[in-house]
């Protein structure tokens, strides 16, 4: 009887010790959420809602071309500002789809205005979620029109695969591949093609 009593004490004590030493599955992420806001995993990069647009896109090499373009266009402070701003952010792969030499030309100092025009053609004043875009599409017979900071027009539609497609002034299409990435100064959506404005030569 004594032996069984001792065995029970050992088991119970061990369980208590394990419970005391147990750690949450994601202690770092949980603490970040509590302190800094929501965390969203975007292709392996953890973007935090308390960061501004520049801070978050700067966390991943996938947006290095966009970051450089924003800097060269003199728009860094714009996308750091309180906003709110909605940015449709092209990935590096999206920029690679541009015709050969166009990006290199845009990044030259004498094309700063053209580059500024291109980047601001991806931005809208206000914080616009995918649900907001969908509602506007549905309330306008399947097509929504948005005015960008550059003054250009973006048309949004829903394709057969239920993707939201943005159409630029040239008829070029870009799919929103990642969406509703909250920023301290607005909203970030990732797009798979560059939206090229029509009225300026690129």
Sequence positions of predicted segments:
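Bacterial Sec-dependent N-terminal signal peptides
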Residues: 1-24
């Amino acid at each position: 009887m004594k032996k069984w009593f001792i065995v029970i004490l050992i088991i119970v004590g061990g369980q208590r010790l394990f419970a005391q030493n147990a750690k949450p599955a994601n202690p770092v992420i949980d603490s970040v959420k509590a302190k800094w806001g929501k965390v969203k995993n975007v292709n392996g990069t953890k973007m935090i809602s308390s960061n501004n647009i520049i801070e978050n896109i700067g966390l991943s090499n996938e947006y290095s071309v966009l970051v450089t373009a924003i800097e060269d266009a003199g728009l860094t402070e714009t996308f750091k500002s309180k906003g709110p701003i909605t940015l449709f952010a092209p990935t590096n792969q999206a920029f690679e789809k541009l015709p050969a030499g166009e990006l290199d030309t845009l990044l030259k100092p004498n094309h700063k205005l053209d580059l500024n025009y291109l980047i601001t053609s991806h931005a809208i004043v206000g914080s616009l979620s995918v649900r907001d875009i969908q509602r506007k599409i549905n309330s306008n017979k399947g097509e929504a029109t948005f005015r960008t900071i550059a003054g250009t027009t973006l048309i949004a539609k829903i394709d057969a695969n239920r993707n939201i497609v943005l159409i630029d002034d040239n008829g070029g299409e870009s799919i929103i591949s990642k969406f509703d990435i909250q920023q301290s100064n607005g909203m970030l959506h990732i797009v798979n093609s560059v939206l090229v404005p029509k009225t300026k030569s690129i």
